[in-house]
């Protein structure tokens, strides 16, 4: 793991470090370990074959390795101006750094975006993107299909969400959106979706969401992004 960090591939180094904790996180540790090793192998093979991959997939490989993208390069991408509803956020520990992932939905464009803010342990993260509010911002998206974006303004204007009635997806539609996301990026670990349904339990007694025609399992516990 340390060698990966030295090689400027910190995200891959983090994956290798986390392998030691798989047994503590999952009772089915052997299966989880095999799956993670398979993911790492796929990243390595994709890097070796990067010259033959489409640009979006190469960008996804760079992200999985943790190769940095200069802010100037991101801000050179076309801007997307909108009133963005902050639908949710999650704080994740990444070594000695805490990362806050905030999911934004553009009211005009219907686009999703993910803003990531970082702070060292014991430092306070900025509270710009608070769930249940909206921000007026011009975003620039990172290369690839990860939905990660960067705002032109360090402190965009914020306000309450008013007169917003989003059109939810049926559960089948949410599943199709996830399928398309994984097809475009095999390492995708989360995609936001607004769905309609009610709580239920599946045949195994696990909590799920149903709209009467399909069911979506609800899971908890450790994850990279939500």
Language model segments and positions:
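Long, compositionally biased intrinsically disordered terminal regions
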Residues: 3-8, 14-53, 59-92, 99-101, ...
């Amino acid at each position: 793991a340390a060698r990966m960090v030295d090689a400027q591939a910190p995200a891959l180094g983090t994956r290798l470090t986390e392998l030691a904790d798989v047994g503590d996180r999952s009772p089915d540790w052997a299966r989880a370990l095999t799956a993670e090793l398979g993911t790492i192998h796929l990243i390595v093979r994709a890097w070796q074959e990067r010259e033959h991959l489409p640009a979006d997939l190469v960008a996804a490989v760079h992200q999985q390795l943790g190769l940095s993208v200069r802010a100037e390069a991101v801000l050179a991408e076309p801007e997307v101006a909108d009133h963005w509803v902050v639908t949710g956020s999650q704080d994740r520990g990444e070594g000695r750094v805490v990362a806050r992932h905030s999911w934004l939905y553009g009211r005009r464009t219907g686009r999703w975006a993910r803003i990531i803010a970082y702070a060292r342990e014991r430092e306070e993260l900025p509270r710009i993107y608070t769930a249940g509010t909206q921000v007026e911002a011009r975003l620039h998206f990172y290369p690839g299909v990860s939905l990660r974006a960067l705002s032109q303004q360090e402190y965009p204007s914020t306000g309450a969400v008013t007169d917003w009635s989003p059109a939810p997806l049926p559960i089948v539609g949410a599943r199709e959106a996830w399928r398309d996301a994984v097809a475009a990026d095999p390492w995708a670990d989360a995609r936001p979706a607004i769905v309609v349904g009610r709580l239920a339990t599946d045949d195994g007694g696990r909590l799920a969401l149903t709209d009467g025609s399909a069911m979506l399992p609800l899971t908890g516990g450790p994850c990279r992004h939500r």
